Amino acid sequence: SKVDYFSSICYNVLGLIKIFERRGILRVKCFHLGAYGTNCFLAYDENNIAYFFDCGGHNLDKVYEFISEYNLDLKYIVLTHGHGDHIEGLNDLASHYPEAKVYIGEEDKDFLYNSELSLSDAIFGEFFKFKGEIHTVKEGDMVGDFKVIDTPGHTIGSKSFYYEKDKILISGDTLFRRSYGRYDLPTGSLEMLCHSLKKLSKLPDETVVYNGHTDNTTIGEERRFLERVGIL
């Protein structure tokens, strides 16, 4: 069933926070949100300009507290794709920060209004519909200082976001640690996913990969993995 896929990545860590610290211009914090513990990332620069990537649950109190404590200016709410475990808390977050703009890949926009695409009913038992304004992005666009990389396959509109100055990649459910996203859900494609993985493998080896459901990794590590399994 549809929900079987998501149960396979459920960490049962509802409400817990895991912090990843990196030296450099950008700092990245990981919050595990929703029933599946989706990795949702708060990134902020030296000027306290902040980005929030994916919003997998309603348990946002720790997010609000952190943003307030560090006096961050949340300007960008960014979705790597439109599956329910990445959008469940979107209405809550967007209403709490009405000045922040919400971004998603243009091909995945319909996921925010169609539960058959987002699988939100199977994931968290609700028919999700986004209530705010959405901004769509495509290959080569910039969201603040992050460059949009078109990485379809898990969904047709999956995007990754690359912060070149610090070599940080937000990969959503396209590339995991020693794994990659499923391609047999609505709009998914193995051919497109393989193309996307090959594209990401061309980034610098030292690029740190923050993904939707596993520990962070690097492009160099995952290039070697993809070579071993025959994708590269």
Question: What is each residue range found by the language model?
Answer:
Residues 20-21, 31, 43, 139-144:
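Short acidic-hydrophobic surface loop/beta-edge motif
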Residues 51, 78, 102, 147, ...:
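Residue-level marker for buried hydrophobic side chains located in beta-strands
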Residues 58, 119-120, 148-150, 155-232:
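Metallo-beta-lactamase
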Residues 58-60, 65-143, 224-228:
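Active-site HxH/HxHxD metal-binding segment of metal-dependent hydrolases
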Residues 24-70, 160-172:
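Conserved beta-strand hairpin/beta-sheet module of binuclear metal-dependent hydrolase folds
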Residues 31-32, 132-134, 150-152:
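Short Gly/Pro-enriched turn/cap motifs at secondary-structure boundaries
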Residues 5, 11-12, 18:
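Short, positively charged and aromatic/hydrophobic N-terminal segments
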